[in-house]
Amino acid sequence: MKTAKIFWCTGMSDTGKTTLTSHAKIELEQHGFKVLIIDGDVVRKKYITQLGFNREDVEKNNLNVAEICLNERDKYDAIIVPIISNIETVRCTVRKLLSPNFYLIYLYADIASLKARDPKGLYKKADQGIIKDLIGYSNSNPYDVPEEFDLRIDTSAESDLLRSKNMFTTFITNKIFTASSLP
């Protein structure tokens, strides 16, 4: 019976969570591992009543994602969760629910880098006052920097994308290998 390692990948919007997660999934599956990605944004969109980004809605979405992880854990070698997950107390609750074999990966990028890449135009919209609660950018909606994490990757320099992908994938691969042999 499998017991997936869970990799909770947190960081502000556009730090590279989805990019690194997608790369890791491909690499791991090429080595025979069974991998599930549970994207926080995808789960958020499945609610009948659309969730916002206030503390209550973020907590609800994070806890729902954690419950999905628990329900799917015995089917996979790794579950990777790209999610903003900006509230420290909620991350601590999720860690308790999903431990053992829970790993928090913190992706950091400086604001200048985030504004420069901004593929969805979120930072521009926040600067224009169109978005008033952009997590970690708007004063009304802070991003609590994790007090404890298992891996921190600075994704500020896009030229280091290959290095970031390698760090991310190597970390996950090493954690999978510590508890199991090749599938």
Task: Map each language-model feature to its residues.
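Glycine-rich phosphate-binding loop used to anchor ATP phosphates in small-molecule kinases
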Residues: 56-99, 104, 124
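Hydrophobic anchor at the beta1->P-loop junction of P-loop NTPases
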Residues: 9
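Conserved beta-strand scaffold positions in the cores of enzyme catalytic domains, especially
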Residues: 6, 37, 102-106, 150-152
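Conserved lysine of the Walker
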Residues: 17
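Small-molecule kinase domains that catalyze NTP-dependent phosphoryl transfer to phosphate-bearing small molecules
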Residues: 108-111, 116-183
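Phosphate-binding P-loop
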Residues: 1-4
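Conserved substrate/cofactor phosphate-moiety recognition/catalytic segment
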Residues: 21-67, 72
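The conserved Walker
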Residues: 13
